[in-house]
């Protein structure tokens, strides 16, 4: 018996909210407000907040926040464990499938793009290639590794700065382990996100307000015990090349703990570095497509609580969710 077109039709696409924006723009407050109002599950899309070692220094949601709404993928990896876009995407897809209303929250643009637009199908280079790339970096330095890469994979080398050791090591390990450069892998076809309709709530506050928030937040982190948190990790003598050691404020506090700079200087440098990073984040988000224009809502102020959740945005979200049901 032939099924009717209605019986054969695919199920309606499910709603997915993305709360994105630069560091300290108020993403966590907005995501929590949305989760409480609409019954959502918050899924972390911030690379550094994946690490269990970094609760204070990354401003992870507090235990009270986590009790107020379901939170997923926060503090799920040790610093010594690998966290990258491919690993995160696999975990995030599983969390999306389990959530009634998934709410992605984070500022790691590469993670969000990998989920929505797909990710290059790069195989695992393997431990030997990874170790050799690290050895080359430690022995010769980033400039020499960049020159080595330029001679063998110029398409990738032209996109990397000689002063960026982490990305250079990643490019080297991929070339060594797969025989193919990162640029070639990134040019390969990729599958995007199927079965979901995406709404983007993009926070883009004025830079002076953001800079003020960054400074206040770092001082609050120090008062809450960020220095002790970093000292506990430093006591383990971790590999200096670990990506998790690049979390905002960590390099500066490590330098202070080593006696190289004062705590005031560490705070000043951390605030400046974070502010510079937020400028790059804001630029990236303005030029990347994570949702259709009609489902993209840009919020020009820094959110601190749900009282700034405008009724027009609420109505848009309700309409968006209902269309998916």
Curated annotation (Swiss-Prot):
Domain of life (superkingdom): Bacteria
Keywords: ATP-binding, Magnesium, Nucleotide-binding, Transferase, tRNA processing
Sites annotated Interaction with substrate tRNA: 108, 130
Catalytic activity: adenosine(37) in tRNA + dimethylallyl diphosphate = N(6)-dimethylallyladenosine(37) in tRNA + diphosphate
GO molecular function, one term: ATP binding
Top-level EC class as recorded in UniProt: transferase
GO BP field: tRNA modification
Region (Interaction with substrate tRNA): 166-170
InterPro entries noted in UniProt: Dimethylallyltransferase, IPT, P-loop_NTPase
Residues binding substrate: 23-28
Cofactor: Mg(2+)
Membrane-spanning intervals of the chain: none
HAMAP family attached to this UniProt entry: IPP_trans
PANTHER family assigned: TRNA DIMETHYLALLYLTRANSFERASE
Family indicated by similarity: Belongs to the IPP transferase family.
Assembly information from the UniProt record: Monomer.
Protein name listed in UniProt: tRNA dimethylallyltransferase
Taxonomic source organism: Acidiphilium cryptum (strain JF-5)
Lineage, highest ranks first: Bacteria, Pseudomonadati, Pseudomonadota, Alphaproteobacteria, Acetobacterales
Protein encoded by which gene: miaA
């Amino acid at each position: 018996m032939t099924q009717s077109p209605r019986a054969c039709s695919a199920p309606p696409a499910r709603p997915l909210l993305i709360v994105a924006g630069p560091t300290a723009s108020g993403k966590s407050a907005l995501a929590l407000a949305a989760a409480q109002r609409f019954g959502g599950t918050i899924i972390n899309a911030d690379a550094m907040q994946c690490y269990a070692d970094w609760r204070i220094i990354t401003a992870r949601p507090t235990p009270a926040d986590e009790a107020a709404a379901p939170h997923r993928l926060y503090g799920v990896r040790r610093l010594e464990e690998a966290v990258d876009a491919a690993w995160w995407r696999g975990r995030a897809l599983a969390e999306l499938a389990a959530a009634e209303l998934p709410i992605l929250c984070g500022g790691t643009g590469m993670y969000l793009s990998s989920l929505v637009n797909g990710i290059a199908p790069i195989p695992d280079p393997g431990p030997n290639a990874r170790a050799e790339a690290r050895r080359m970096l430690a022995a010769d330095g980033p400039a020499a590794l960049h020159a080595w890469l330029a001679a063998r994979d110029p398409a990738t080398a032209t996109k990397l700065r000689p002063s960026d050791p982490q990305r250079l090591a990643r490019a080297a390990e991929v070339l060594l382990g797969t025989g193919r450069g990162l640029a070639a892998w990134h040019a390969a076809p990729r599958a995007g996100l199927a079965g979901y309709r995406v709404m983007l709530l993009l926070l883009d506050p004025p830079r002076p307000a953001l800079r003020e928030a960054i400074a206040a937040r770092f001082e609050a982190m120090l008062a809450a015990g960020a220095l002790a948190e970093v000292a506990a990790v430093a006591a383990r003598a971790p590999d200096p090349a670990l990506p998790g050691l690049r979390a905002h404020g960590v390099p500066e506090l490590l330098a202070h703990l080593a006696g190289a700079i004062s705590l005031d200087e560490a705070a000043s440098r951390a605030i400046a570095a974070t502010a510079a990073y937020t400028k790059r984040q804001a630029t990236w988000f303005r030029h990347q497509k994570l949702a259709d224009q009609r489902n993209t809502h840009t919020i020009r102020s820094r959110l601190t609580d749900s009282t700034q959740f405008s009724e027009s945005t609420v109505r848009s979200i309700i309409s968006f969710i209902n269309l998916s049901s």
